[in-house]
Amino acid sequence: AKAAAITFVDLIPEKINLGLVVFDGVARVQVAPTTDRQLMVDAIQRLELGESTAIGEAIFASLDAIASVPPDEEGTIPPARVVLMSDGVTQQGRPNEDAAEEARTRGIPVSTISFGTPFGQIVYEEPGQAPQLVEVPVDQDELRAIADATSGTFFTAESAGELEQVYNDIGSSVGFVTADREITHWFVAGAIALLMLTAALSLAFFSRLP
């Protein structure tokens, strides 16, 4: 899953700033918007498995990050988009529905990727404790509902290969609209499981044009 995220970062046009929001039971901005792709890659590679999932908080954190970016010289705030990858099961923080409603109110579509299978399992290890088998089934309905509520698009991926293809499809569609000036603003958020078939630790990307 890390490799798929890194591939996605590489696909985004260099002039577009990317940021990273990491979330498990809470959400936090790991990398502020930057065109430094190596900084993003290094941050993704350092991700470690955590407990719980707060998808709603990740969306709220992403929306706040978008709101903190100043408008251009003409005072225009370009449109934004969110792409979220996870298993859809929120265990901590504010409900997904509240986050989706806030995104809809702000006019920011949230596309979602369901990553995993209905019978997914992982082995979770805490230092000094015996490994535990953890059930992490995918809840596609929650992720589909987020996309539907915000005019986003819903995707599914049951393997690392399928996930990479989804990111390829999304990344290849991110670019510039040429008019009198560059006006496209992409906020790309992806909640991606650190290990395949788990959503214990997730991340989100956000971006905007310089």
Each predicted region: which residue ranges?
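C-terminal signal-anchor/stop-transfer transmembrane helix together with its immediate cytosolic
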Residues: 172-210
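…and closely analogous acidic/polar surface helices at protein-protein or active-site interfaces
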Residues: 1-18, 32-37
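Solvent-exposed coil/turn segments that connect beta secondary-structure elements
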Residues: 14, 23-26, 36, 45-49, ...
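Juxtamembrane amphipathic/hinge helix adjacent to a transmembrane helix
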Residues: 152-181
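Generic structural signal for helix capping and beta-alpha/helix-loop junctions
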Residues: 28-30, 120, 164
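Non-transmembrane functional regions of envelope-associated proteins
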Residues: 20-21, 28-48, 60, 67, ...
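VWA/integrin I-like adhesion module and closely mimicked acidic/polar interface patches used
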Residues: 47-49, 53, 57-60, 72-81, ...
